[in-house]
Swiss-Prot record:
Transmembrane segments: none annotated. The keyword Magnesium does not apply. Keywords: Heme, Iron, Metal-binding, Monooxygenase, Oxidoreductase. This is Putative cytochrome P450 CYP13A1. The keyword Ribonucleoprotein does not apply. Its cofactor is heme. Cytochromes P450 are a group of heme-thiolate monooxygenases. They oxidize a variety of structurally unrelated compounds, including steroids, fatty acids, and xenobiotics. It comes from Caenorhabditis elegans. Heme binds at residue 465. The lineage of its organism: Eukaryota, Metazoa, Ecdysozoa, Nematoda, Chromadorea. Pfam families: p450 (PF00067). InterPro entries: Cyt_P450 (IPR001128), Cyt_P450_CS (IPR017972), Cyt_P450_E_grp-I (IPR002401), Cyt_P450_sf (IPR036396), Insect_CytP450_Detox (IPR050476). The gene is cyp-13A1.
Length: 519
């Protein structure tokens, strides 16, 4: 009996093995250079090394293979580019062909998720979410959030004064994470006051960012799509409540409580006041022209009438949750890198403090004063150039067969920008590309010139980060208050250069600083 089944098992094994070898050699068969990795796995194992972030690995491969190369991650095929013309073609010129993001199949189909967020959505649904959400990040909306952000900044300043007393070094990364979580908690998750250094959400969020999803992504990268979806549904039904689900539940409770409060106020004849946070803004948000958007067989470029101009409760949960995930780590890291660079370049820090003294002479700092801090903007831009912390987000998925340069690109191919190489390319930035030089941003039209050439810390094109202005507002408010009272100085615990770690984002292991009180 065993001999009867042996040929069948052998044939199946050979067929499966041949299939994976065929996938593994995809780029080689097309004459595209790149790292091969291992059969079946490709370079998947490289993406799991927390001590050598994958964006830095891509930078090393670019040095070896050039500005365009390919690799496989299981059955996923990725083309890496760092040529500014190709980047502009993918993100802007051919946006209609590359409007999807790079996703692992284990993450599911974003179009079928009730809580799909603006980052993951694509096509018609992305257009609708973007249209409804955009007013939430307008200047007028940010003004309504300003006082909450500044209150959190002043609360952090009190903790800094206490913890750094007596010349003690403090890890600014941890302090900045407390600040950004406090802000997001208050403007997106229904938190009513500051919970800094006692926030019950912090362990949940930290666990989410420190989580190892390697096994899940391995399943998504290796197994056929239909099997991945079956496994995914089983996991969703049987997994214990994880960090992501806990955050969703906290947000959903906050939204339901806000809706209930609004209904009670209306019954009692109480008018709804000015929006206090994202929940209020999203509940009020409408897009007048959303009826012009539509869906036609999944093709976002063809429209039919769709009249739901407001977000559903589930969609509000999705937006608030993704803003927590996107805003917590990235803003804290941007502040951390800027702090490190200022401490290691005291002449630049002194120049920035002079601007702060000049433009913000009074204890109260207004949102209009922030717009006058031009040199501070240059400092943050330059910090994000040298440390593009969210480089993984600069990726796209090919949605239609097309050509990129002279290369044919098939549907399903992932495009990943090597942002670290792009941001320090001497052909773009000059011989001082590796230097921290905020003054390079003071040249006329520098924003337009550099973005066209390849400066993309917040992405590029229609899908550029919607929260960019909020992030800058948070960073400016906090840095103004700190630099008015302290000067950042390195100490015995400061790692120079920084030791970089991470998977989803590239972050320093720590940013220990002395905060020397100013006269």
């Amino acid at each position: 009996m065993g001999y009867f089944w042996f040929p069948w098992f052998s044939a199946i094994f050979v067929a499966v093995f041949s299939y994976y070898i065929w996938q593994w050699t995809f780029w080689r068969r097309r004459g595209v250079v790149g790292p091969m990795g291992f059969p079946v796995l490709g370079v998947f194992l490289n993406s799991l090394d927390n001590n050598f972030p994958f964006p830095l690995q891509c930078r090393e491969w670019t040095k070896k293979f050039g500005k365009i190369y390919g690799f496989t991650e299981g059955t996923l095929k990725t083309l890496v580019i760092s040529d500014p013309e190709l980047v502009h073609e993918v993100f802007v010129t051919q946006y209609d062909n590359f409007y999807g993001r790079k996703r692992n199949p284990i993450q599911g189909d974003s179009e079928k998720e009730k809580r799909t967020n603006l980052f993951a959505a694509q096509g018609f649904r992305w257009k609708r979410l973007r249209a409804i959400s955009s007013p939430t990040f307008s200047n007028s909306s940010l003004r309504k959030l300003y006082q909450t952000v500044e209150d959190s900044a002043l609360e952090l300043l009190r903790h800094i004064e206490k913890q750094s007393a007596g010349g003690k070094q403090i890890d600014m990364l941890k302090f900045y994470q407390e600040f950004t979580l406090d802000v997001i908690g208050r403007i997106a998750m229904g938190q009513t006051d500051s919970q800094m250094f006692k926030n019950p959400i912090m362990p949940i969020v930290s666990k989410l960012f420190q989580g190892n999803f390697a096994k899940l992504f391995l399943i998504g990268g290796i197994f056929p799509t239909f099997l991945v979806e079956i496994i995914r549904q089983i996991l969703l039904k049987n997994l214990k409540v994880g960090s992501f689900r806990k955050i969703n539940e906290i947000t959903l409770d906050a939204i339901h409580n806000r809706i209930k409060q609004r209904e009670e106020d209306q019954k009692n004849g109480i008018e709804i006041g000015e929006p206090a946070d994202f929940i209020d803004l999203f509940l009020d948000a409408k897009a007048e022209d959303v009826e012009h958007f539509g869906e036609n067989n999944g093709d976002f470029s063809k429209s039919t009438t769709y009249t739901n101009r407001q977000l559903t409760t589930e969609e509000i949960v999705g937006q608030c949750t993704v803003f927590l995930i996107a805003g917590f780590d990235t803003t804290a890291l941007s502040l951390s890198y800027a702090t490190y660079l200022l401490a290691t370049h005291p002449e630049i820090q002194k120049k920035l403090q002079e601007e702060v003294n000049r433009e913000c002479p009074n204890p109260e700092v207004t949102i209009d004063q922030l717009s006058k801090l031009k040199y501070m903007e240059c400092v943050f831009k330059e910090a994000l150039r040298l440390y593009p912390l969210g480089a993984f987000a600069n990726s796209r998925r090919c949605m239609r067969n097309t050509k990129l340069g002279n290369m044919k690109v098939e549907v399903g191919t992932m495009i990943q920008v090597d942002t670290w190489t792009l941001h320090t390319d001497p052909n773009i930035w000059g011989d001082d590309a590796e230097d921290f030089k905020p003054e390079r941003w003071q040249t006329p039209n520098s924003d337009q010139i550099y973005q066209k050439s390849g400066y993309i810390p917040f992405g590029l094109g229609p899908r550029q980060c919607i929260g960019m202005r909020l992030a800058y507002m948070e960073e400016k408010i906090l840095l103004v208050h700190i630099l008015r009272k302290f000067t950042f100085e390195t100490g015995a615990k400061t790692e120079i250069p920084l030791k970089l770690i991470g998977r989803a984002t590239t972050q320093p292991e720590s940013v220990w600083m002395h905060l020397n009180p100013r006269n």
